[in-house]
Amino acid sequence: MFKGVYTALITPFKNRAVDYTALAKLVEQQINGGIHGLVPCGTTGESATLSHEEHKAVIRTVVELVQGRVKVLAGTGSNCTEESTELTCYAEEVGADGALLITPYYNKPTQAGLIAHYTTVANHTKLPVVLYNVPGRTAVDMHADTVIALSKVSNIVAIKEATGNMERASQIHKGAGSSMTLISGDDATFLPFLSVGGQGVISVTTNLAPRLVRDLWDLWHNGQINEAREVHEQLLEINGLLFCETSPIPVKAGAAMLGLCHNELRLPMTAMSEANQAKLHRAMVKLNLLEE
């Protein structure tokens, strides 16, 4: 259902408010770049520092801007099950195609708690639900057995697995089979992830280079493995730089270099260091995203 190249969309700000003009520009740039879907209000979209009203408005606006041209997988996760349920139901109401739910962060639920959380949200919506495991952010790791158990819930259809752990991905694929679509949440390991059963990526890099990541996907699916590896290697440097400081700090800087938005984040996020911005600029020039 959610296969291919999806962009973990940044949320542009101007003078501390959401910049809806820039958001429209970003959406068009992404669709023109060939992506299969957009993910507003995820980690890359600074969802943790959006108010609930802003969170809903961004989801609604992206759905309206897309007009069915690509899929919209709305970020609706929270560390509070009731809040996540509310956001998910709202995403369904305004026409999103699915909901992406990060594991509840900070309060560190057990595996039983994770199953209860996701099952509760899924039971309140008809939307397809995508799990999201990123323990480096949340301090809770969703085990393969937990994912396999949740695959039995009819509208829990996929997982964004952001650990970059191929063994984990293989365990999920073996245990859940076709009932759980595997989506990479780690740009640097997208290609090897495909080799163990992955069927897509939710990418940070596509904010800057959507066509290149789409090319990698197309080459892989056309059986052009060596050519796909060449694109993978072209992207290695920028994939690394986009996480050399806490994401989305670097990708916001890169988007500003492309003239897509202001280089503005919400505290406690601060702008990328000048030294790292220079490195990112050089990497973008190498990929012909920018001129010298």
Swiss-Prot record:
GO terms for molecular function: 4-hydroxy-tetrahydrodipicolinate synthase activity. It catalyses: L-aspartate 4-semialdehyde + pyruvate = (2S,4S)-4-hydroxy-2,3,4,5-tetrahydrodipicolinate + H2O + H(+). One of its GO terms (biological process) is diaminopimelate biosynthetic process. SUPFAM superfamilies: Aldolase. It is found in: Cytoplasm. The active site is at Y132, K160. Pathway: Amino-acid biosynthesis; L-lysine biosynthesis via DAP pathway; (S)-tetrahydrodipicolinate from L-aspartate: step 3/4. The record marks T43, Y106 as: Part of a proton relay during catalysis. Pfam families: DHDPS (PF00701). CDD domains: DHDPS (cd00950). Pyruvate binds at T44, I202. It is an enzyme of class 4 (lyase). Homotetramer; dimer of dimers. Belongs to the DapA family. Catalyzes the condensation of (S)-aspartate-beta-semialdehyde [(S)-ASA] and pyruvate to 4-hydroxy-tetrahydrodipicolinate (HTPA). This is 4-hydroxy-tetrahydrodipicolinate synthase. It comes from Magnetococcus marinus (strain ATCC BAA-1437 / JCM 17883 / MC-1). The lineage of its organism: Bacteria, Pseudomonadati, Pseudomonadota, Alphaproteobacteria, Magnetococcales. The gene is dapA.
